[in-house]
Protein backbone atom coordinates (compact mmCIF):
# COMPACT_ATOMS: atom_id res chain seq x y z
CA UNK A 1 0.00 0.00 0.00
CA UNK A 2 1.13 3.47 -0.72
CA UNK A 3 0.91 6.03 2.05
CA UNK A 4 0.58 9.78 1.84
CA UNK A 5 3.59 12.00 2.26
CA UNK A 6 4.31 12.68 5.87
CA UNK A 7 2.05 9.86 7.11
CA UNK A 8 3.52 7.23 9.33
CA UNK A 9 2.94 3.69 7.95
CA UNK A 10 1.01 1.52 10.37
CA UNK A 11 1.67 -2.15 10.97
CA UNK A 12 -1.08 -4.51 9.84
CA UNK A 13 -0.64 -6.97 12.69
CA UNK A 14 -1.52 -5.99 16.27
CA UNK A 15 1.16 -4.79 18.58
CA UNK A 16 2.28 -6.64 21.68
CA UNK A 17 0.22 -4.39 23.90
CA UNK A 18 -3.10 -5.61 22.45
CA UNK A 19 -4.61 -8.55 24.28
CA UNK A 20 -7.25 -10.69 22.57
CA UNK A 21 -9.45 -13.15 24.43
CA UNK A 22 -8.36 -16.74 23.91
CA UNK A 23 -10.99 -19.22 22.91
CA UNK A 24 -10.99 -22.99 23.05
CA UNK A 25 -9.20 -23.21 26.41
CA UNK A 26 -10.78 -24.27 29.70
CA UNK A 27 -11.52 -21.78 32.39
CA UNK A 28 -8.44 -20.71 34.28
CA UNK A 29 -8.49 -20.53 38.06
CA UNK A 30 -6.21 -18.40 40.19
CA UNK A 31 -3.85 -20.88 41.83
CA UNK A 32 -0.40 -20.32 43.30
CA UNK A 33 1.18 -21.73 40.16
CA UNK A 34 -1.23 -20.03 37.78
CA UNK A 35 -1.90 -23.30 35.92
CA UNK A 36 -5.14 -24.40 37.50
CA UNK A 37 -8.03 -25.51 35.32
CA UNK A 38 -11.54 -26.75 36.01
CA UNK A 39 -12.79 -30.14 34.91
CA UNK A 40 -16.36 -31.04 33.97
CA UNK A 41 -17.26 -31.72 37.60
CA UNK A 42 -16.04 -28.34 38.81
CA UNK A 43 -12.85 -29.64 40.38
CA UNK A 44 -9.58 -27.78 40.03
CA UNK A 45 -6.64 -29.64 38.52
CA UNK A 46 -3.23 -28.80 37.15
CA UNK A 47 -2.53 -30.31 33.78
CA UNK A 48 0.41 -32.71 33.88
CA UNK A 49 0.55 -32.86 37.67
CA UNK A 50 -0.54 -35.94 39.61
CA UNK A 51 -3.49 -35.79 41.95
CA UNK A 52 -2.50 -34.70 45.48
CA UNK A 53 -2.01 -37.51 47.96
CA UNK A 54 -4.60 -36.25 50.43
CA UNK A 55 -7.26 -36.61 47.72
CA UNK A 56 -5.94 -40.09 46.95
CA UNK A 57 -6.27 -40.98 50.63
CA UNK A 58 -9.82 -39.69 50.64
CA UNK A 59 -10.69 -41.78 47.59
CA UNK A 60 -9.39 -44.96 49.22
CA UNK A 61 -11.16 -44.22 52.50
CA UNK A 62 -14.52 -43.62 50.81
CA UNK A 63 -14.12 -46.81 48.78
CA UNK A 64 -13.30 -48.69 52.00
CA UNK A 65 -16.62 -47.54 53.48
CA UNK A 66 -18.50 -48.96 50.49
CA UNK A 67 -19.18 -45.77 48.55
CA UNK A 68 -19.47 -46.34 44.82
CA UNK A 69 -16.83 -44.80 42.52
CA UNK A 70 -19.41 -42.67 40.71
CA UNK A 71 -20.46 -41.09 44.02
CA UNK A 72 -16.81 -40.54 44.99
CA UNK A 73 -16.24 -38.84 41.65
CA UNK A 74 -19.14 -36.43 42.15
CA UNK A 75 -18.36 -35.59 45.78
CA UNK A 76 -14.62 -35.05 45.39
CA UNK A 77 -15.06 -33.51 41.90
CA UNK A 78 -12.49 -35.85 40.42
CA UNK A 79 -13.00 -37.53 37.07
CA UNK A 80 -14.31 -41.07 37.16
CA UNK A 81 -11.33 -42.39 35.20
CA UNK A 82 -8.93 -40.99 37.78
CA UNK A 83 -10.90 -42.53 40.67
CA UNK A 84 -11.12 -45.95 39.06
CA UNK A 85 -7.44 -45.94 38.13
CA UNK A 86 -6.33 -45.03 41.66
CA UNK A 87 -8.56 -47.71 43.21
CA UNK A 88 -7.45 -50.35 40.72
CA UNK A 89 -3.79 -49.59 41.32
CA UNK A 90 -4.31 -49.63 45.08
CA UNK A 91 -5.98 -53.05 44.89
CA UNK A 92 -3.13 -54.42 42.77
CA UNK A 93 -0.10 -52.91 44.50
CA UNK A 94 -1.36 -51.52 47.81
CA UNK A 95 0.09 -48.12 46.90
CA UNK A 96 -1.56 -44.84 45.99
CA UNK A 97 1.56 -43.22 44.63
CA UNK A 98 1.40 -41.90 41.08
CA UNK A 99 3.25 -44.04 38.60
CA UNK A 100 4.31 -43.81 35.01
CA UNK A 101 1.50 -43.53 32.51
CA UNK A 102 1.23 -46.57 30.33
CA UNK A 103 3.43 -49.63 30.35
CA UNK A 104 2.65 -52.98 31.89
CA UNK A 105 0.79 -53.21 35.17
CA UNK A 106 3.02 -53.79 38.20
CA UNK A 107 2.78 -57.29 39.53
CA UNK A 108 2.02 -57.68 43.21
CA UNK A 109 4.93 -59.86 44.30
CA UNK A 110 5.26 -58.73 47.92
CA UNK A 111 2.73 -57.72 50.52
CA UNK A 112 2.64 -54.22 52.07
CA UNK A 113 4.15 -55.63 55.29
CA UNK A 114 7.16 -57.00 53.45
CA UNK A 115 7.59 -53.71 51.61
CA UNK A 116 7.64 -51.85 54.93
CA UNK A 117 10.37 -54.13 56.26
CA UNK A 118 12.42 -53.54 53.14
CA UNK A 119 12.03 -49.78 53.45
CA UNK A 120 13.11 -49.85 57.10
CA UNK A 121 16.16 -51.93 56.23
CA UNK A 122 17.08 -49.48 53.46
CA UNK A 123 16.80 -46.53 55.82
CA UNK A 124 18.97 -48.18 58.45
CA UNK A 125 21.53 -49.37 55.94
CA UNK A 126 22.34 -47.35 52.82
CA UNK A 127 22.43 -49.11 49.49
CA UNK A 128 26.19 -48.73 49.07
CA UNK A 129 26.97 -50.66 52.28
CA UNK A 130 24.58 -53.61 51.91
CA UNK A 131 27.16 -55.80 50.25
CA UNK A 132 29.73 -55.02 52.93
CA UNK A 133 27.26 -55.78 55.70
CA UNK A 134 26.49 -59.11 54.12
CA UNK A 135 30.19 -59.85 53.79
CA UNK A 136 30.81 -58.88 57.40
CA UNK A 137 28.04 -61.15 58.61
CA UNK A 138 28.77 -64.18 56.50
CA UNK A 139 32.43 -63.63 55.63
CA UNK A 140 35.50 -62.39 57.45
CA UNK A 141 34.58 -59.72 59.99
CA UNK A 142 37.16 -57.02 59.27
CA UNK A 143 37.04 -54.02 61.54
CA UNK A 144 38.28 -51.78 58.75
CA UNK A 145 35.24 -52.51 56.64
CA UNK A 146 32.95 -51.76 59.56
CA UNK A 147 34.65 -48.42 60.18
CA UNK A 148 34.38 -47.52 56.52
CA UNK A 149 30.68 -48.32 56.62
CA UNK A 150 30.16 -46.05 59.60
CA UNK A 151 32.02 -43.21 57.92
CA UNK A 152 29.94 -43.54 54.76
CA UNK A 153 26.77 -43.57 56.81
CA UNK A 154 27.77 -40.39 58.66
CA UNK A 155 28.65 -38.68 55.40
CA UNK A 156 25.33 -39.66 53.87
CA UNK A 157 23.49 -38.15 56.82
CA UNK A 158 25.39 -34.87 56.42
CA UNK A 159 24.57 -34.55 52.73
CA UNK A 160 22.56 -31.55 51.69
CA UNK A 161 18.85 -31.92 51.21
CA UNK A 162 19.00 -30.34 47.76
CA UNK A 163 21.40 -32.97 46.42
CA UNK A 164 20.22 -35.74 44.13
CA UNK A 165 20.81 -38.41 46.76
CA UNK A 166 18.92 -36.41 49.34
CA UNK A 167 15.96 -35.96 46.99
CA UNK A 168 15.78 -39.53 45.74
CA UNK A 169 16.57 -41.26 49.03
CA UNK A 170 13.58 -41.63 51.29
CA UNK A 171 14.17 -40.10 54.71
CA UNK A 172 12.81 -41.62 57.90
CA UNK A 173 10.05 -39.57 59.61
CA UNK A 174 10.86 -37.97 62.94
CA UNK A 175 7.73 -39.13 64.77
CA UNK A 176 4.54 -41.15 64.24
CA UNK A 177 2.56 -37.91 64.11
CA UNK A 178 4.64 -36.69 61.22
CA UNK A 179 4.23 -40.08 59.55
CA UNK A 180 0.47 -39.72 59.64
CA UNK A 181 0.67 -36.20 58.31
CA UNK A 182 3.22 -37.02 55.65
CA UNK A 183 1.92 -36.58 52.14
CA UNK A 184 4.62 -38.71 50.53
CA UNK A 185 5.46 -41.77 52.57
CA UNK A 186 2.13 -42.68 54.13
CA UNK A 187 0.11 -45.47 52.59
CA UNK A 188 -3.46 -46.19 53.65
CA UNK A 189 -3.70 -49.51 55.43
CA UNK A 190 -7.32 -50.07 54.42
CA UNK A 191 -8.41 -53.36 52.89
CA UNK A 192 -10.67 -52.94 49.89
CA UNK A 193 -13.18 -55.54 48.87
CA UNK A 194 -12.58 -57.10 45.52
CA UNK A 195 -15.12 -56.06 42.94
CA UNK A 196 -17.30 -59.11 42.44
CA UNK A 197 -19.38 -59.57 39.34
CA UNK A 198 -23.03 -59.12 40.17
CA UNK A 199 -25.38 -61.82 39.00
CA UNK A 200 -28.01 -60.83 36.47
CA UNK A 201 -31.19 -59.53 38.07
CA UNK A 202 -34.30 -61.60 37.35
CA UNK A 203 -37.62 -59.79 37.61
CA UNK A 204 -40.87 -61.48 38.53
CA UNK A 205 -44.09 -60.98 36.58
CA UNK A 206 -45.48 -58.64 39.25
CA UNK A 207 -42.34 -56.53 39.22
CA UNK A 208 -42.34 -56.29 35.42
CA UNK A 209 -46.01 -55.31 35.42
CA UNK A 210 -45.35 -52.57 37.97
CA UNK A 211 -42.37 -51.29 36.01
CA UNK A 212 -44.23 -51.33 32.70
CA UNK A 213 -47.11 -49.33 34.17
CA UNK A 214 -44.66 -46.74 35.42
CA UNK A 215 -42.94 -46.67 32.02
CA UNK A 216 -46.26 -45.93 30.30
CA UNK A 217 -46.68 -42.88 32.51
CA UNK A 218 -43.18 -41.49 32.03
CA UNK A 219 -39.97 -42.63 30.39
CA UNK A 220 -37.78 -40.51 32.67
CA UNK A 221 -38.92 -40.89 36.30
CA UNK A 222 -37.38 -38.65 38.94
CA UNK A 223 -35.65 -39.85 42.09
CA UNK A 224 -38.84 -39.79 44.16
CA UNK A 225 -40.75 -41.85 41.61
CA UNK A 226 -37.91 -44.36 41.40
CA UNK A 227 -37.71 -44.74 45.17
CA UNK A 228 -41.46 -45.20 45.49
CA UNK A 229 -41.43 -47.72 42.65
CA UNK A 230 -38.50 -49.56 44.24
CA UNK A 231 -40.44 -49.91 47.50
CA UNK A 232 -43.52 -51.26 45.75
CA UNK A 233 -41.56 -53.68 43.56
CA UNK A 234 -39.15 -54.63 46.38
CA UNK A 235 -36.11 -53.58 44.37
CA UNK A 236 -33.27 -51.16 44.89
CA UNK A 237 -33.38 -47.70 43.37
CA UNK A 238 -30.27 -48.48 41.33
CA UNK A 239 -31.94 -51.55 39.76
CA UNK A 240 -35.01 -49.46 38.87
CA UNK A 241 -32.83 -46.82 37.27
CA UNK A 242 -30.95 -49.39 35.19
CA UNK A 243 -34.23 -51.06 34.14
CA UNK A 244 -35.62 -47.75 32.87
CA UNK A 245 -32.43 -47.08 30.94
CA UNK A 246 -32.61 -50.48 29.24
CA UNK A 247 -36.34 -50.11 28.61
CA UNK A 248 -35.85 -46.74 26.92
CA UNK A 249 -33.20 -48.24 24.66
CA UNK A 250 -35.53 -51.09 23.70
CA UNK A 251 -38.39 -48.63 23.08
CA UNK A 252 -36.23 -46.53 20.74
CA UNK A 253 -35.21 -49.63 18.82
CA UNK A 254 -38.83 -50.76 18.39
CA UNK A 255 -39.94 -47.28 17.33
CA UNK A 256 -37.23 -47.18 14.67
CA UNK A 257 -38.24 -50.60 13.34
CA UNK A 258 -41.92 -49.58 13.15
CA UNK A 259 -41.06 -46.43 11.22
CA UNK A 260 -38.99 -48.46 8.76
CA UNK A 261 -41.86 -50.90 8.18
CA UNK A 262 -44.31 -48.04 7.62
CA UNK A 263 -41.92 -46.47 5.14
CA UNK A 264 -41.54 -49.75 3.25
CA UNK A 265 -45.31 -50.02 2.83
CA UNK A 266 -45.33 -46.67 1.05
CA UNK A 267 -42.89 -47.92 -1.60
CA UNK A 268 -44.50 -50.09 -4.36
CA UNK A 269 -41.35 -52.16 -4.79
CA UNK A 270 -41.16 -52.96 -1.10
CA UNK A 271 -44.01 -55.51 -1.11
CA UNK A 272 -42.88 -59.04 -0.34
CA UNK A 273 -43.09 -61.61 -3.11
CA UNK A 274 -45.81 -63.50 -1.22
CA UNK A 275 -48.18 -60.54 -1.57
CA UNK A 276 -48.06 -60.73 -5.39
CA UNK A 277 -50.55 -63.38 -6.57
CA UNK A 278 -49.50 -65.60 -9.40
CA UNK A 279 -51.61 -65.07 -12.52
CA UNK A 280 -51.68 -67.18 -15.69
CA UNK A 281 -50.26 -65.78 -18.87
CA UNK A 282 -52.53 -64.55 -21.61
CA UNK A 283 -52.21 -65.61 -25.22
CA UNK A 284 -52.36 -63.21 -28.15
CA UNK A 285 -52.11 -64.23 -31.75
CA UNK A 286 -49.36 -62.65 -33.88
CA UNK A 287 -50.85 -63.72 -37.23
CA UNK A 288 -53.11 -61.71 -39.52
CA UNK A 289 -56.14 -60.71 -37.50
CA UNK A 290 -59.17 -61.21 -39.77
CA UNK A 291 -62.61 -60.90 -38.17
CA UNK A 292 -63.74 -64.29 -39.47
CA UNK A 293 -60.62 -66.10 -38.19
CA UNK A 294 -60.64 -64.86 -34.59
CA UNK A 295 -61.65 -68.18 -32.96
CA UNK A 296 -59.19 -70.18 -35.02
CA UNK A 297 -56.30 -67.76 -34.40
CA UNK A 298 -56.77 -67.73 -30.68
CA UNK A 299 -57.40 -71.45 -30.39
CA UNK A 300 -54.24 -72.32 -32.32
CA UNK A 301 -51.51 -72.78 -29.70
CA UNK A 302 -48.69 -72.83 -32.26
CA UNK A 303 -48.98 -69.13 -33.14
CA UNK A 304 -49.27 -67.66 -29.68
CA UNK A 305 -46.95 -65.55 -27.56
CA UNK A 306 -47.04 -65.76 -23.78
CA UNK A 307 -46.76 -62.47 -21.95
CA UNK A 308 -46.83 -62.70 -18.13
CA UNK A 309 -48.22 -59.57 -16.51
CA UNK A 310 -47.89 -59.19 -12.74
CA UNK A 311 -50.61 -57.30 -10.95
CA UNK A 312 -50.32 -55.14 -7.85
CA UNK A 313 -52.40 -56.29 -4.88
CA UNK A 314 -54.72 -53.28 -5.15
CA UNK A 315 -55.92 -54.16 -8.66
CA UNK A 316 -56.58 -57.87 -8.17
CA UNK A 317 -60.22 -58.79 -7.56
CA UNK A 318 -60.94 -62.21 -6.13
CA UNK A 319 -64.07 -63.78 -7.57
CA UNK A 320 -66.04 -66.94 -6.98
CA UNK A 321 -65.13 -69.49 -9.62
CA UNK A 322 -67.58 -72.08 -10.93
CA UNK A 323 -67.55 -75.63 -9.65
CA UNK A 324 -66.06 -76.98 -12.86
CA UNK A 325 -62.35 -76.07 -12.92
CA UNK A 326 -62.11 -76.64 -16.68
CA UNK A 327 -64.86 -74.22 -17.55
CA UNK A 328 -62.85 -70.99 -17.44
CA UNK A 329 -59.36 -69.51 -17.47
CA UNK A 330 -58.55 -65.87 -16.74
CA UNK A 331 -56.54 -64.01 -19.38
CA UNK A 332 -55.68 -60.35 -18.73
CA UNK A 333 -54.15 -57.65 -20.87
CA UNK A 334 -52.25 -54.72 -19.31
CA UNK A 335 -52.95 -51.06 -19.75
CA UNK A 336 -50.79 -48.01 -19.20
CA UNK A 337 -52.43 -47.18 -15.87
CA UNK A 338 -52.31 -50.66 -14.28
CA UNK A 339 -55.85 -51.32 -15.45
CA UNK A 340 -56.56 -54.76 -16.91
CA UNK A 341 -59.27 -55.83 -19.29
CA UNK A 342 -60.42 -59.31 -20.14
CA UNK A 343 -59.66 -60.61 -23.61
CA UNK A 344 -61.72 -63.55 -24.86
CA UNK A 345 -62.64 -65.27 -28.09
CA UNK A 346 -66.40 -64.96 -28.62
CA UNK A 347 -68.35 -61.80 -29.26
CA UNK A 348 -71.06 -60.28 -27.09
CA UNK A 349 -73.95 -58.80 -29.05
CA UNK A 350 -75.18 -55.24 -28.50
CA UNK A 351 -77.71 -54.69 -25.74
CA UNK A 352 -80.12 -52.58 -27.73
CA UNK A 353 -81.69 -52.69 -31.19
CA UNK A 354 -79.92 -49.50 -32.19
CA UNK A 355 -76.53 -51.24 -32.08
CA UNK A 356 -76.36 -53.68 -35.03
CA UNK A 357 -73.56 -56.27 -35.12
CA UNK A 358 -70.92 -56.29 -37.80
CA UNK A 359 -72.16 -58.63 -40.56
CA UNK A 360 -68.71 -59.99 -41.25
CA UNK A 361 -68.30 -61.07 -37.66
CA UNK A 362 -71.78 -62.51 -37.46
CA UNK A 363 -71.29 -64.64 -40.57
CA UNK A 364 -68.27 -66.37 -39.00
CA UNK A 365 -70.29 -67.76 -36.07
CA UNK A 366 -72.74 -70.62 -36.02
CA UNK A 367 -76.46 -69.95 -35.40
CA UNK A 368 -76.26 -71.87 -32.09
CA UNK A 369 -73.59 -69.53 -30.73
CA UNK A 370 -75.45 -66.48 -31.99
CA UNK A 371 -78.58 -67.68 -30.23
CA UNK A 372 -76.74 -68.14 -26.97
CA UNK A 373 -75.23 -64.68 -27.20
CA UNK A 374 -78.48 -62.92 -28.07
CA UNK A 375 -80.29 -64.53 -25.10
CA UNK A 376 -78.00 -62.73 -22.64
CA UNK A 377 -78.26 -59.27 -24.10
CA UNK A 378 -80.19 -57.89 -21.13
CA UNK A 379 -77.37 -58.00 -18.61
CA UNK A 380 -76.94 -54.54 -17.03
CA UNK A 381 -74.16 -52.45 -18.42
CA UNK A 382 -71.19 -51.46 -16.24
CA UNK A 383 -69.20 -48.78 -18.03
CA UNK A 384 -65.45 -49.05 -17.66
CA UNK A 385 -62.99 -47.24 -19.88
CA UNK A 386 -59.43 -48.37 -20.40
CA UNK A 387 -56.64 -48.13 -22.90
CA UNK A 388 -57.29 -49.54 -26.36
CA UNK A 389 -55.60 -52.70 -27.60
CA UNK A 390 -53.84 -53.12 -30.91
CA UNK A 391 -53.84 -56.81 -31.91
CA UNK A 392 -51.18 -56.39 -34.60
CA UNK A 393 -48.48 -54.95 -32.37
CA UNK A 394 -49.54 -56.61 -29.14
CA UNK A 395 -49.24 -53.24 -27.36
CA UNK A 396 -51.51 -50.40 -26.30
CA UNK A 397 -52.81 -47.40 -28.19
CA UNK A 398 -52.34 -43.87 -26.78
CA UNK A 399 -54.84 -42.68 -24.16
CA UNK A 400 -56.93 -40.97 -26.85
CA UNK A 401 -58.02 -44.31 -28.24
CA UNK A 402 -60.03 -45.30 -25.19
CA UNK A 403 -62.57 -48.05 -25.57
CA UNK A 404 -65.06 -49.78 -23.32
CA UNK A 405 -63.27 -52.88 -22.01
CA UNK A 406 -64.55 -56.02 -20.46
CA UNK A 407 -64.70 -56.13 -16.69
CA UNK A 408 -63.02 -58.82 -14.61
CA UNK A 409 -65.64 -60.43 -12.38
CA UNK A 410 -66.75 -63.94 -13.20
CA UNK A 411 -70.44 -64.88 -13.17
CA UNK A 412 -71.55 -68.37 -13.95
CA UNK A 413 -73.85 -68.44 -16.95
CA UNK A 414 -76.57 -71.07 -16.61
CA UNK A 415 -77.05 -71.41 -20.34
CA UNK A 416 -73.38 -72.42 -20.79
CA UNK A 417 -73.35 -75.16 -18.13
CA UNK A 418 -73.59 -77.81 -20.82
CA UNK A 419 -70.33 -76.67 -22.38
CA UNK A 420 -67.18 -78.29 -20.97
CA UNK A 421 -64.86 -75.38 -21.77
CA UNK A 422 -66.28 -72.07 -22.94
CA UNK A 423 -64.75 -68.63 -23.18
CA UNK A 424 -66.63 -65.44 -24.06
CA UNK A 425 -65.33 -62.31 -25.65
CA UNK A 426 -66.15 -58.61 -25.45
CA UNK A 427 -65.77 -57.39 -29.03
CA UNK A 428 -63.94 -54.20 -29.89
CA UNK A 429 -64.73 -52.22 -33.02
CA UNK A 430 -62.09 -52.78 -35.69
CA UNK A 431 -61.20 -50.17 -38.26
CA UNK A 432 -60.17 -51.18 -41.78
CA UNK A 433 -56.78 -49.49 -41.61
CA UNK A 434 -55.28 -50.13 -38.17
CA UNK A 435 -57.17 -53.12 -36.76
CA UNK A 436 -57.20 -51.40 -33.37
CA UNK A 437 -59.85 -50.87 -30.77
CA UNK A 438 -61.33 -47.42 -31.33
CA UNK A 439 -64.19 -45.73 -29.52
CA UNK A 440 -67.50 -45.79 -31.37
CA UNK A 441 -70.39 -43.82 -29.95
CA UNK A 442 -73.09 -46.07 -31.32
CA UNK A 443 -71.92 -49.28 -29.65
CA UNK A 444 -72.48 -50.20 -26.01
CA UNK A 445 -71.52 -53.70 -24.96
CA UNK A 446 -72.95 -55.36 -21.88
CA UNK A 447 -70.50 -56.07 -19.08
CA UNK A 448 -70.51 -59.32 -17.12
CA UNK A 449 -68.51 -58.38 -14.03
CA UNK A 450 -64.80 -57.94 -13.38
CA UNK A 451 -63.24 -61.25 -14.43
CA UNK A 452 -62.68 -63.28 -17.59
CA UNK A 453 -65.49 -65.16 -19.34
CA UNK A 454 -65.69 -68.66 -20.67
CA UNK A 455 -63.96 -69.41 -23.93
CA UNK A 456 -65.95 -71.23 -26.58
CA UNK A 457 -64.61 -74.50 -27.89
CA UNK A 458 -63.37 -74.31 -31.48
CA UNK A 459 -65.46 -77.32 -32.57
CA UNK A 460 -68.70 -75.52 -31.57
CA UNK A 461 -67.94 -72.66 -33.91
From Swiss-Prot:
Q: List the disulfide bonds.
A: none
**One Pfam family cited in the UniProt record for this chain:** PAX
Give UniProt keywords alphabetically.
Answer: Developmental protein, Differentiation, DNA-binding, Homeobox, Neurogenesis, Nucleus, Paired box, Transcription, Transcription regulation, Wnt signaling pathway
A single GO molecular function, which one? Answer: DNA binding
Q: Where do the record's region annotations for Disordered lie?
A: 1-21, 141-205, 290-330
GO BP terms: fibroblast growth factor receptor signaling pathway; hatching gland development; nervous system development; neural crest cell fate commitment; neural crest formation; positive regulation of DNA-templated transcription; Wnt signaling pathway
Instruction: List every stretch annotated RED subdomain.
Output: 113-171
Gene3D superfamilies per UniProt = Homeodomain-like, Winged helix-like DNA-binding domain superfamily/Winged helix DNA-binding domain
| The protein, known as | Paired box protein Pax-3
Provide ranges: composition bias, Acidic residues.
177-188
| Family, per entry | Belongs to the paired homeobox family.
Chain intervals with Polar residues compositional bias: 290-306
Localization annotation? Nucleus
Write out the biased-composition intervals (Low complexity): 319-329
Write down the species.
Answer: Xenopus tropicalis
Amino acid sequence: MTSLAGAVPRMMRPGPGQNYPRTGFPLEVSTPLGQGRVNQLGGVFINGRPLPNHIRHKIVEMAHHGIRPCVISRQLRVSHGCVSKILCRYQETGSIRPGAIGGSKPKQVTTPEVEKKIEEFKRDNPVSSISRILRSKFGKGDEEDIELDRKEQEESEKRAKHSIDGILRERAPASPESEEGSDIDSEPDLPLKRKQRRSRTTFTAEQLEELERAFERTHYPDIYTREELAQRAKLTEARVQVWFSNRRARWRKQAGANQLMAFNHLIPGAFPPAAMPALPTYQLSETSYQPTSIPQAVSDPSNTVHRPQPLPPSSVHQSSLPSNPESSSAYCLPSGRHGFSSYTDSFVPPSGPSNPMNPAIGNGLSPQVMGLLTNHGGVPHQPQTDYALSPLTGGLEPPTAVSASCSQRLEHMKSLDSLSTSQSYCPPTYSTSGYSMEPVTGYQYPQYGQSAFHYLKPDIA
